[in-house]
Each structure stands twice: as structure tokens, then as C-alpha cells.
């Protein structure tokens, strides 16, 4: 018997074995990336992240301690900063725009369990973060969310729904608290230091 109550038959055993081997390979890759996250050189970490499938540019920065799930589903734009100890989930695609500043300890998920289902199956939803977004420390972004251009997410906020352009959201769950008073978003976040 399989763990969710379905019988294992001769017909479906080979695909299950292959799927399990793929899962083990992914888990091994994620374990290696966890260790890579603590290499003190930004450039060496980026090389390993790129080799694991993360689509990122030379001008983006991922600080130490970042963790990933399904790196091949993650795209990071130009001049974007990912802070220390962030978690990035690529199971249903995670697209992060250019000039985005994601502070430390931010969690971005695009998969969660259906708590109303008897089988507790996964529910996937891609996450899109547009250009010039700032996400404060320890914020949580949940599956299926789009964060509009120039939006600001306050520290500790839990984002459960789409956020329009240039709005400031805070709280649990996050709600609009202000509009961002800026007309022309054209700043650069700066270059990373060698050992960041």
C-alpha cells in the first residue's frame, strides 16, 4: 500500500520508483545548496545557484544562508538583492523582477496543502514580484500572489492576495496602509561586496 491508501501494482511500480529516485536527486541537490549558501564568496555562491537551475543575472545578489526548493523554477531579474536566510520556492515558478530588494528572512512559497481535502494534496500557485518592489524582513509571501511594480511589503507581513502597483501593505494578513509617493521608479540598489 502506498502512503495515501492507493494500492501499488506491477503496472505502476516502475514509474513510482523513477519518481522516487528523482525526488532523492532533488533532495541531494537542495542539501548541497544549503551548504553552498554559507560559502563567504558571493560570486562562488552565484555560480552554484546558476548551475542548479536558478535563472539570475550577473548584477543580482543572493546573500548568505538562502535556501531553495526546485531552483529551476526561479527567475531573478537585474540588480535585485535577496537578503540573508531567505527561502525561495520554485515549484510553481517564482519570478522576481529587476531592482527588487528582498530583506533578510523572507519566505516566498508557491505551494501549500489543501487543508479541506481528505488527501491533504498540494495546491500550487506561481508567485510574481514585479520591478522595484521592497519586501521587509521576515515577511511571508503565499502561493498565487502577484506583487505590483514599486509595491512595499512591511516587515513581518503575510501576503495572501495580489498587491497593486506602488502600494504599501502591512499586517497579518497584509492590508493596504498607504500609497507609495514616488512618480519615477528608476533607482539602482548598488553593487554587492565580494564577501557578502
Residue ranges with predicted function:
Residues 61:
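Glycine-rich phosphate-binding "P-loop"
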Amino acid at each position: 500500500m502506498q502512503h495515501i491508501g492507493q494500492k501499488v501494482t506491477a503496472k505502476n511500480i516502475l514509474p513510482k520508483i523513477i519518481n522516487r529516485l528523482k525526488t532523492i536527486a532533488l533532495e541531494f541537490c537542495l542539501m548541497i545548496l544549503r551548504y553552498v549558501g554559507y560559502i563567504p564568496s558571493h560570486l562562488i555562491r552565484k555560480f552554484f545557484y546558476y548551475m542548479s537551475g536558478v535563472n539570475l543575472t550577473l548584477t543580482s545578489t543572493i546573500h548568505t544562508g538562502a535556501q531553495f526548493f526546485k531552483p529551476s523554477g526561479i527567475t531573478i531579474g537585474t540588480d535585485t538583492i535577496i537578503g540573508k536566510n531567505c527561502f525561495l520556492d520554485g515549484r510553481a515558478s517564482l519570478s522576481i523582477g529587476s531592482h527588487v530588494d528582498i530583506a533578510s528572512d523572507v519566505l516566498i512559497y508557491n505551494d501549500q496543502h489543501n487543508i479541506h481535502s481528505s488527501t491533504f494534496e498540494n495546491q500550487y500557485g506561481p508567485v510574481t514580484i514585479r520591478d522595484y518592489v521592497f519586501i521587509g524582513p521576515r515577511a511571508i509571501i503565499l502561493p498565487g500572489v502577484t506583487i505590483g511594480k514599486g509595491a512595499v511589503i512591511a516587515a513581518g507581513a503575510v501576503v495572501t492576495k495580489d498587491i497593486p502597483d506602488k502600494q504599501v501593505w502591512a499586517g497579518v494578513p497584509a492590508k493596504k496602509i498607504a500609497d507609495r509617493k514616488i512618480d519615477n521608479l528608476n533607482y539602482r540598489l548598488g553593487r554587492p561586496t565580494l564577501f557578502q
